[in-house]
């Protein structure tokens, strides 16, 4: 196999990985500029690899080892080459081509160490820090593939990520509760007279609902701010924020009085594509050219 064939295989592997495990972000890349799709897929494939470590191990230590491999790889101290790891190979290409900040990628790995343990998310500040270094980081890295790295873009990425990340915490609540993992801030639950055990019981109670409603409300405020900042952003960077259209749809559903946060919701792939297509034609997300 030639090196060119190997790179094509790596790109194809990453595309399939993201399509399988993160269809929303995969679908969003279909509306990005052609030259951005490969680096975007590389970034999202890396995120899939890191965020799925919790699902692939039964004990924290093997998870720590896997995450450390990625940290070493980014630091240039990988145990062996990356030729056998298509995601690492594609990510390194994207880092070199678009000068992606390695520090942000490393912090994303560090934050996902929290996933390996069943310690509760203690405070809203802790949740915001976690989301800022995961969801917000992905928006920031995606913007870099459009040649946009600035304090203004970072500000936009932060609010976009907070809206998306909190929505994802809410969407994952049924699964997390079933394995006794808590990403909803314990401090927030206690402020509303609820507890970790009430969440783990998987039954909607007024105290739990009050805490979750506050969290959804804060996510919607971040989304509102993100859309206001997006309107001022360069046209070429707007398409990478297209996943916000899905976040807006989810937060609207979560805010409804008849929403049960402990009932898993499955969104059809066709519905995801339709939402993204419609949003891509709107003024908010339309790119240049």
Walk through the language-model features, giving the residues of each.
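Catalytic cores of Mg2+-dependent Asp-rich isoprenoid enzymes
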Residues: 1-92, 101-112, 131-140, 152-166, ...
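Alpha-helical transmembrane segments of multipass membrane proteins
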Residues: 141-145
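Acidic/His metal-coordination segments adjacent to aromatic residues that form catalytic metal sites
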Residues: 113-126, 201-204
């Amino acid at each position: 196999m030639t090196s060119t064939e190997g790179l094509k295989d790596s790109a194809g592997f990453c595309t399939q990985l993201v399509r399988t495990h993160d269809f929303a972000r995969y679908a969003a890349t279909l509306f990005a500029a052609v030259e951005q799709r490969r680096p975007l897929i590389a970034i999202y494939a890396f995120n899939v690899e890191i965020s799925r470590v919790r699902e692939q191990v039964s004990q924290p230590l093997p998870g720590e080892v896997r995450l450390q491999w990625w940290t070493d790889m980014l630091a240039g101290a990988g145990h062996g080459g990356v030729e056998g790891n298509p995601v690492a190979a594609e990510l390194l290409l994207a880092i070199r081509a678009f000068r992606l900040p390695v520090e942000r990628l490393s912090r994303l790995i560090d934050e996902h160490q929290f996933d390996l343990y069943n310690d509760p998310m203690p405070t809203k500040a802790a949740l915001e820090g976690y989301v800022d270094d995961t969801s917000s980081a992905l928006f920031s890295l995606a913007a870099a593939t459009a040649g946009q790295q600035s304090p203004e873009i970072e500000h936009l990425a932060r609010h976009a990520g907070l809206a998306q990340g909190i929505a994802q915490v809410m969407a994952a609540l049924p699964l997390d509760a079933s394995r006794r993992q808590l990403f909803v801030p314990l401090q927030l639950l206690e402020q509303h007279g609820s507890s970790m055990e009430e969440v783990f019981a998987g039954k909607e109670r007024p105290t739990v609902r009050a805490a979750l409603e506050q969290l959804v409300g804060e996510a919607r405020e971040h989304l509102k701010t993100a859309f206001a900042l997006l309107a001022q952003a360069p046209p070429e960077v707007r398409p990478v924020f297209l996943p916000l259209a899905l976040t807006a749809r989810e937060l609207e559903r979560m805010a409804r009085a008849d929403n049960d946060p402990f009932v898993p919701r499955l969104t059809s792939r066709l519905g995801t594509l339709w939402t993204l297509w419609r949003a891509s034609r709107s003024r908010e997300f339309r790119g240049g050219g």
